[in-house]
Every structure is written in structure tokens, then in C-alpha cells.
Amino acid sequence: DESAHNILLKRFQYYLLVGGMPEAINNYLADRNMTRVRQTHKDIHNLYRIDASQYDEDHKLKIRKIYDLVPSNLENKKKRMVYKNIEGKKGKTFSDYADEFEYLTNSGVALEVSAISNPRFPLVESEQKRLVKLYLNDVGLLTSLLYGLNVNAVLQDIKSVNLGTVYESVVAQELAAHGFKLHYYDNKKKGEVDFLVDDHGKLNVLPIEVKSGKDYTQHSALNNFLETSDYGINRAIVFSNERKVFEKRGVTYL
């Protein structure tokens, strides 16, 4: 019922603030003190930044820069990594920073999402490493970096705050935690879909969209994707804030 839904929603909102790091959770449960929780997030964030001791100084600096760019990149429209911003040099590509990206993803500090323009099962056969998104490994770290101690950014319905990046990060973390390799759809003519995952049961690809606004049934890129007969994909999932579960034209809204 609505009462139970509101309770679960409030707890989910606090999860967005606290995240899943054991120390952050324990500090929150001890006295509900968000100042202590945010300090824990800062400590973990700083530890991640300096925890590249196996590399020489040049690699360390690039790893830190890439990691520091993650929140601001996610706030951009395309959300993908802009390689020229890492060192302020034009003409740079993914291959110039492959070692740094590998460190961040293999260590679990960041989640890599590779582009797919022509989806086929299994997705790994058609991924493009040149267009990569990175998400932080914990949503609490992200909201700490974005909003600091202002919990109202998440707890209140503030029109000036777009929580799309936060919700996408949660979905990325959950998909990764359940063993899915992360991809997204990027096509100049058809648009972009937030996530693509392999559906091993149906030997097909499952597209996933994450919506934070009231217009969650409007998704032109997803429609274009599903209407492309060459792909042979006729089902998708859209996550939203609405307390409604229904299916329409192959799209399941949750």
C-alpha cells in the first residue's frame, strides 16, 4: 500500500545518502549523524585517490585526475569520459589511458560502461572502448561529492536538483553486483540508452532506461532502439520514481 511504499522510498533515499560502505553504514546506525557519515565518505574518497602506490608518479596523477572527473562527467549530458580533460591535451583517446582505466575498474574503485552502437548478443563482441562512461562504486560517495551535508538534495523534491545521475549510479552498481558486464547504447542517428545487458535466458540483449522525472514514459531513443528491426529486440525496462508497475508495447515500467 501507499504507506509501505513511502516507508521503503524514504529508506531508499537514505541509502542514496549513506551508500553501502560498511564503515559509513555503521556510523549512520550508531547515531544517525550524517556529518560523521560524510566524513567517512571523504576519508574513503581520499584513500582511493592516493591508493595507486604501485604506479610511478605520472600514472598516479592520471589515475587521480580520471577519478576526480567522474562526478562532473556524469553531470554532463553525454556522461562519458572526455579524454582531453584528463591532461588538458587534445587528440587523446582511450588507448592513451588504458592502464589507468584498467586500474580503476579492476580495483573496484569505478565501474566502466562501454558503448555499443550495433547491439548483438553477447554484447562484448561489439563494444567500443573509445566511448566510455565511469560510475563511482558507491552511491554514498557520489552524493557526498555532489551535495555535501545538504541531505535535502535527496530527501526533498527540489526542482533545481536533477537526481538522474544518482539513480543511474545505483542501477549501475546493482547490475554490476549481480554479475552483469555494463554497456550503454550510443548511436548518432537513434540516440542513447542508459544500459544494455546480456539476457542469457533469451540469448538476446535487454535495454534499460533510468528516469528521474514525471515524463518517464517518454523515451525517443529507446523507442528508436526497439523499432530497429535489424536488432531483433522487442522488450525493455524503464525504472522510474512512480509507484506504478505496468507493461506497454514491450516496455516494462518499474
Question: PLM features: residue spans?
Answer:
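Amphipathic alpha-helical segments of the small helical/lid subdomains adjacent to P-loop NTPase cores
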Residues: 1-20
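Accessory nucleic acid-recognition modules appended to NTPase machines
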Residues: 16, 21, 25-200
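Short conserved micro-motifs at the rims of enzyme active sites and ligand-binding pockets
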Residues: 145-149, 220-221, 248-250
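Active-site ExK catalytic segment of metal-dependent nucleases
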Residues: 205-214
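Active-site-adjacent loop/helix micro-motif of nuclease/hydrolase catalytic cores
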Residues: 214-224
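Arginine/glycine-rich "motif VI" loop of SF2 helicases in the C-terminal RecA-like domain
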Residues: 225-232
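Short, hydrophobic beta-strand segments that form beta-sheet elements in well-ordered domains
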Residues: 234-240
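Domain-level recognition of nuclease-like catalytic cores that cleave nucleotide substrates
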Residues: 241-254
